[in-house]
Amino acid sequence: MIKLRKNIANMAGYVPGYQPEDPAAYIKLNTNENSYPPSPKVIEAIIAEVGEGLKRYPDAASRAAREAAAELYGFPPEWVIMANGSDEVLNNLIRAFADEGDEIAFVYPSYSYYATLAEVQGARVKTFGLTEDWKLKDFPKIYEGRIFFLTNPNAPLGFTFSQTYIEELAGRVSGTLVIDETYADFAEVTSLELVRKYDNVVVTRTFSKSYSLAGMRLGLAVARPEVISALDKIRDHYNLDRLAQAAAVAALHDQEYLRETVGKIQETRQWFCDQLGKLGYTVIPSHGNYVFATPPDRNGERIYQGLFDRKILVRHFSDPNLAHGLRISIGTQAEMEKTIVALVEIG
């Protein structure tokens, strides 16, 4: 008889957004992917890497990608680690800093995968709710848990914490403060400077959203060298393949394309929010590539099903505190115009 660890046997596991077998048949606005293609320079770099060199292992340290990220963000390379998606960094941070039975915490609502990763490690989970002015409810003067995850901008709601408040939290977290900046490029805000000021701050980033590389699995973290060294010890030794490393370098070097793509999404986001308002939806002002919108009748499931029937995928959460609304990714202008037409039809 197979005997699993008790925490693994008892956990539910993370449930990602629906991935259709034929994504081209849908307007896909449910997993916050970027509807625009990657930079042409990224495609060129990947194609150039395909060849005889694939028979050799990749650079285990991903040095070229680390150096490109370090140069972009203004840090020495030893302050940066590359990852097979930012989820790998999040996982390894818990492995590095939390023993079985230790407490990790995060904001509710935010990325539910934090809880899954904690359960795998056997850590205890605590959540902190939000006040109306987007601060943490009942957060202690000093939080003594091992890790506190702060998603900024918040997902699924889209608001941002002020940098002043985040710095205040850095001084109130006795363990490690992980600032998950998955959507920061769309907000044009960052807490990277806090890494220089506080030795317990880690900032994570992904290439899945603003760089249009969700299918490549690329992420990174910026932290003090002693933290990066610890993460280096426990990561998979060849965690980024040759194609991913080439893509990362090319993407980081083409900031002009990133700004162009992000700019389009920001413009469409504002247009879409305005249109939702005209339809009577309540929309939380968003700084991500998505919005959280509540229909007038507060029946998010009804709207979700109506859109699904029209081959438009959005995210509806069964959580009773979120079920009234929908998280809708911002696609191209044409995709969002079709979505508005569908919402008018659904009523």
From Swiss-Prot:
Against InterPro entries, the record matches this protein to:
Aminotrans_II_pyridoxalP_BS, Aminotransferase_I/II_large, HisP_aminotrans, PyrdxlP-dep_Trfase, PyrdxlP-dep_Trfase_major, PyrdxlP-dep_Trfase_small
Name the enzyme group at the top EC level. transferase
Q: Which reaction does it catalyse?
A: L-histidinol phosphate + 2-oxoglutarate = 3-(imidazol-4-yl)-2-oxopropyl phosphate + L-glutamate
Q: Under which EC number(s) is this enzyme classified?
A: 2.6.1.9
Q: Which residues carry this modification: N6-(pyridoxal phosphate)lysine?
A: 209
Query: What SUPFAM superfamilies does the entry give?
Result: PLP-dependent transferases (SSF53383)
Q: Which UniProt keywords apply?
A: Amino-acid biosynthesis, Aminotransferase, Histidine biosynthesis, Pyridoxal phosphate, Transferase
Pathway given for this chain reads:
Amino-acid biosynthesis; L-histidine biosynthesis; L-histidine from 5-phospho-alpha-D-ribose 1-diphosphate: step 7/9
**One MF term in the entry's GO annotations:** pyridoxal phosphate binding
Q: Which GO terms describe its biological process?
A: L-histidine biosynthetic process
**Obligatory cofactor(s):** pyridoxal 5'-phosphate
Identify the domain of life.
Bacteria
CDD domains reported in the protein's UniProt record: AAT_like
| UniProt cross-references to NCBIfam families, sorted A to Z | hisC (TIGR01141)
Assembly and binders: Homodimer.
Checking HAMAP family in the record gives: HisC_aminotrans_2 (MF_01023)
Q: What does the similarity note say?
A: Belongs to the class-II pyridoxal-phosphate-dependent aminotransferase family. Histidinol-phosphate aminotransferase subfamily.
What is the protein name stated in its UniProt record? Histidinol-phosphate aminotransferase
Q: What organism does the record attribute this protein to? A: Geotalea daltonii (strain DSM 22248 / JCM 15807 / FRC-32)
Coding gene? hisC
